[in-house]
């Protein structure tokens, strides 16, 4: 009988689904229950391939643009990342029943940007170019109204209309530390710049990054369960590396684990991005249990009791 090597596993808590992701997935499942298949979803409802494939198997059809929707008698759901204002307008023009599953914390950023614009301030957006959330936020205002700022170097070369009449908002899934540095650089260059009353980085992003900071320096390796196109999952891997973990990997399924890298470790931390379901954490844990004698301990750094109700279009339908 082969003796398995011992492995101490620290499970980060909180990890996995946030309230906005739960709400978005529930919205698709509730729409399927009420209206039947197909239910169309513009863009991946959340950035997790397992979640998307599971919803496809239940009758969801994912599209990138509304002109890909052939049947306007069936609902279309907007993803948790938010959409430009032109998308609901296009849906209304085509008489499409749209259900907005934008995370309420992303909607908060949209409203902040609109308010700054209404008050005559130029808006700077700290975020990553091309991310659906950034595209959606920029699309809340007339073209050219928002300047995207991606790096501290961008700040040094920014050309603004009036440095005394500026505001900023941020993408919700950024690195907390990077964003803090960006905001500090903005306020140094533009002392009069106006920011949000409460930071735009969402509670789940902050909590998951803080949990990783606690465990990363004391383990041989760390796995982030999540998809490669998930911004918050990518940031967790970066946070682990910056916090002193020499081996940090982003893994979606057990089959993706590069086992040769983990052959000689004695301690491992596992977390999951905000769009990664717990079933994938369990799958990866089971795969490690086949190869190691596990001692598992959960490390809790925050308690989350956040809940967001279903989109109002679905609440009306269930009354």
Swiss-Prot record:
Q: What is the lineage of its organism?
A: Bacteria, Pseudomonadati, Pseudomonadota, Alphaproteobacteria, Hyphomicrobiales
- Cofactor(s) this protein cannot do without: [4Fe-4S] cluster
- Write out the residues that bind (2E)-4-hydroxy-3-methylbut-2-enyl diphosphate: 47, 81, 131, 172, 230-232, 275
Q: What does this protein do?
A: Catalyzes the conversion of 1-hydroxy-2-methyl-2-(E)-butenyl 4-diphosphate (HMBPP) into a mixture of isopentenyl diphosphate (IPP) and dimethylallyl diphosphate (DMAPP). Acts in the terminal step of the DOXP/MEP pathway for isoprenoid precursor biosynthesis.
A GO term for molecular function: metal ion binding
Q: Which CDD domains match?
A: lytB_ispH (cd13944)
Keywords on record:
4Fe-4S, Iron, Iron-sulfur, Isoprene biosynthesis, Metal-binding, Oxidoreductase
In the UniProt entry, which residues are flagged as the active site?
Answer: 133 (proton donor)
- Enzyme Commission no: 1.17.7.4
Top-level EC class? oxidoreductase
- Which residues bind dimethylallyl diphosphate per the record? 47, 81, 131, 230-232, 275
Q: Which reaction does it catalyse?
A: isopentenyl diphosphate + 2 oxidized [2Fe-2S]-[ferredoxin] + H2O = (2E)-4-hydroxy-3-methylbut-2-enyl diphosphate + 2 reduced [2Fe-2S]-[ferredoxin] + 2 H(+); dimethylallyl diphosphate + 2 oxidized [2Fe-2S]-[ferredoxin] + H2O = (2E)-4-hydroxy-3-methylbut-2-enyl diphosphate + 2 reduced [2Fe-2S]-[ferredoxin] + 2 H(+)
Q: Can you name this protein?
A: 4-hydroxy-3-methylbut-2-enyl diphosphate reductase
